[in-house]
Amino acid sequence: MKKATFITCLLAVLLVSNPIVVNAEVAGLIPCKDSAAFNKRMVNSVKKLQARLAKYDANTPPALALNKQIEKTKTRFATYGRAGLLCGTDGLPHLISDGRWSRAGDFVFPGLLFLYITGWIGWVGRGYLLSVAKTSKPTEKEIILDVPLAVKFMSSGFAWPLAAWQEFSSGQLIAPNDDITVSPR
C-alpha cells in the first residue's frame, strides 16, 4: 500500500512539474533586438533627448547631463537587446514565466528580494509592537513612534529569517490558543 501511494505521489509530482514550453511566436513576442517597434522607441527616446540638448550651449551642466542621459538610454536599449528579452507589438519587453530555467533570473531574484524586504518590514514591525506593548502607554507609542527604539529594531532586522526560525523552533513565534481572542458572531 505504501509503495502504491509513493508511486502515485511521484507520478503526480512529475506531471505537475513538467514545464510546458511556450513558443514566443505563438504569443506574438519577438526578440527585442529584432523588433521594429523596440528600435523605434529607442530612436524616439534619443530624438527627444537630443531636441532638449539643442536648447543648451555645449559644455554647460545641462548639456553634459543630457549627453550622459543619451548614452545611458542607448546603453539601456542595447542591454535589453543583448539580454534576449522578448518584446510585444508595442516595443516593450515582456517577461515570460513559463517554467524555463533560462528565464528564471528575470523574475526569481526580484521576487525573492521582494519577499525578503516585506519579511524585514513585518519582522521589525512585530518586534516594535511587542516591545511597545510592555510600556506604560503602548497605544501612544503605536501612534507616535519611538524613533530610537524603531531604529534599533530596523538595524537588527536584516537577519530576520534566522531570528524567525529560532523563534519558531523554540515555540515563541506561535501564540498559544488561550491568547487568541474569538469575536462573538
Swiss-Prot record:
It is a multi-pass membrane protein. The keyword NADP does not apply. Keywords: Chloroplast, Membrane, Photosynthesis, Photosystem I, Plastid, Signal, Thylakoid, Transmembrane, Transmembrane helix. Its main location: plastid. It is found in: Plastid, Chloroplast thylakoid membrane. The chain crosses the membrane at residues 104-124, 143-163. Pfam families: PSI_PsaF. Belongs to the PsaF family. This is Photosystem I reaction center subunit III. It comes from Porphyra purpurea. The lineage of its organism: Eukaryota, Rhodophyta, Bangiophyceae, Bangiales, Bangiaceae. The gene is psaF.
